[in-house]
């Protein structure tokens, strides 16, 4: 489907969970001849990341309202109005055929600006619980899509766009069938790390001894502390790194993952075809719990809410999973994934632009 001459504005910002799926769709449409620009904020990760991907970015001034004091809330209508005016001016200049909102504060004023100019608004919700911005924008959107069932009652479930190197991994049967030796446990705390994983997993390693080998991504500034924790537990042989640059290679190495359950993480693990122990971040709307639930229901994962994530519980769970069990879980994870999510979202963008 050629997009020659078509223009898309992607609205996404704040976190990788919003930005990376937007980039996947943007690159897919650029390859079809679309011209793509990005709407973001100058002080969040998209300001650096998007230009590195060869996409021009425009900025509006907006920030979140959650947890702000009374002064900030009173000033919010004026700030939103100003951001809406900025977004309108940017869109009048660029003249997009369609805008794609992937979440983050920037989507609110951006979506309203597009709607006020008669530009179709397409939304994608990455999480199992809809964010505040997308809840508002759904009322005026041309098309609403969701990664997991339940965020919106009637929205089409299309999965989360995932990086191509993860999608290109061999299927679980090819990757895991001949493996022997200790179970390979990949622990992923994200860029900021997860203190509960950093504190608990060295003690789990001590309980399991040589039945496991662990690669532990500790997060920024925590590598030495976590290495010391493994050494103190009598387990200095395990690998600890601050970051993992090549997640696809890490997934290919692993037999099982222990991690938080951000939307993109859950979707990547399903696409890779890996069993998981998910430890949802404790948030009042339990967003990460709802992200992980479909994989637990599919028999591909186990969820431990943070208070239940104890050394004994995790050690006994890992010890109880044979290689045969892990392979079955891996195949169920892959079966629950949506490998063509990027194409599905891109097709809806194309459809909205033509309507």
Curated annotation (Swiss-Prot):
GO terms under cellular component: plasma membrane
CDD domains (UniProt xref): GT28_MurG
Pathway annotation from the record: Cell wall biogenesis; peptidoglycan biosynthesis
Binding locations of UDP-N-acetyl-alpha-D-glucosamine: 15-17, 127, 163, 191, 244, 263-268, 288
Cellular localisation: Cell inner membrane
GO MF terms, alphabetically ordered: UDP-N-acetyl-D-glucosamine:N-acetylmuramoyl-L-alanyl-D-glutamyl-meso-2,6-diaminopimelyl-D-alanyl-D-alanine-diphosphoundecaprenol 4-beta-N-acetylglucosaminlytransferase activity; undecaprenyldiphospho-muramoylpentapeptide beta-N-acetylglucosaminyltransferase activity
Keyword terms: Cell cycle, Cell division, Cell inner membrane, Cell membrane, Cell shape, Cell wall biogenesis/degradation, Glycosyltransferase, Membrane, Peptidoglycan synthesis, Transferase
Record bears the keyword Repressor: no
Catalytic activity: di-trans,octa-cis-undecaprenyl diphospho-N-acetyl-alpha-D-muramoyl-L-alanyl-D-glutamyl-meso-2,6-diaminopimeloyl-D-alanyl-D-alanine + UDP-N-acetyl-alpha-D-glucosamine = di-trans,octa-cis-undecaprenyl diphospho-[N-acetyl-alpha-D-glucosaminyl-(1->4)]-N-acetyl-alpha-D-muramoyl-L-alanyl-D-glutamyl-meso-2,6-diaminopimeloyl-D-alanyl-D-alanine + UDP + H(+)
InterPro entries: GlcNAc_MurG, Glyco_trans_28_C, GlycoTrans_28_N
Signal peptide (from-to): none
Gene3D superfamilies: Glycogen Phosphorylase B
Similarity section: Belongs to the glycosyltransferase 28 family. MurG subfamily.
The protein's role, per its UniProt record: Cell wall formation. Catalyzes the transfer of a GlcNAc subunit on undecaprenyl-pyrophosphoryl-MurNAc-pentapeptide (lipid intermediate I) to form undecaprenyl-pyrophosphoryl-MurNAc-(pentapeptide)GlcNAc (lipid intermediate II).
Protein name: UDP-N-acetylglucosamine--N-acetylmuramyl-(pentapeptide) pyrophosphoryl-undecaprenol N-acetylglucosamine transferase
């Amino acid at each position: 489907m050629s997009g020659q001459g078509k223009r898309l504005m992607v609205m996404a910002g704040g976190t990788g969970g919003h930005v990376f799926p937007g980039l996947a769709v943007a690159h897919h449409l650029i390859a079809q001849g679309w011209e793509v620009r990005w709407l973001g904020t100058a002080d969040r990760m998209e300001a650096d990341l998007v230009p590195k991907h060869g996409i021009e970015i425009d900025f509006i001034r907006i920030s979140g309202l959650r947890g702000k004091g009374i002064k900030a809330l009173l000033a919010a209508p004026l700030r939103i109005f100003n951001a809406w005016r900025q977004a309108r001016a940017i869109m009048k200049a660029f003249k997009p055929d369609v805008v794609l909102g992937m979440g983050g504060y920037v989507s609110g004023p951006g979506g309203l600006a597009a709607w006020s100019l008669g530009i179709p608004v397409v939304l994608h919700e990455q999480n199992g619980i809809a964010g505040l911005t997308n809840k508002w924008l759904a009322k005026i959107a041309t098309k609403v899509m969701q990664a997991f069932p339940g965020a919106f009652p009637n929205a089409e479930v299309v999965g989360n766009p995932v990086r191509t190197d993860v999608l290109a991994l061999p299927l679980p049967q090819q990757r895991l069938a001949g493996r022997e030796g200790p179970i390979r446990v990949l622990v992923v705390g994200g860029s900021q790390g997860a203190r509960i994983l950093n504190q608990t997993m060295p003690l789990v390693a001590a309980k399991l001894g040589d039945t496991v080998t662990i690669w532990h991504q500790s997060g920024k500034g925590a590598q030495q502390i976590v290495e010391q924790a493994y050494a103190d537990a009598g387990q200095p042989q395990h690998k600890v790194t601050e970051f993992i640059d090549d997640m696809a290679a890490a997934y290919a190495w692993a037999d099982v993952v222990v991690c938080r359950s951000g939307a993109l993480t859950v979707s990547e693990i399903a696409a890779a075809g890996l069993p998981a122990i998910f430890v949802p971040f404790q948030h009042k709307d339990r967003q990460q719990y709802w992200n992980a639930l479909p994989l637990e229901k599919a028999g591909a994962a186990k969820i431990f809410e943070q208070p239940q994530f104890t050394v004994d519980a995790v050690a006994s769970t890992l010890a109880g999973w044979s290689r045969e069990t892990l392979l079955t879980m891996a195949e169920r994870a892959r079966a629950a994934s949506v490998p063509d999510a990027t194409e599905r979202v891109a097709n809806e963008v194309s459809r909205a632009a033509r309507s």
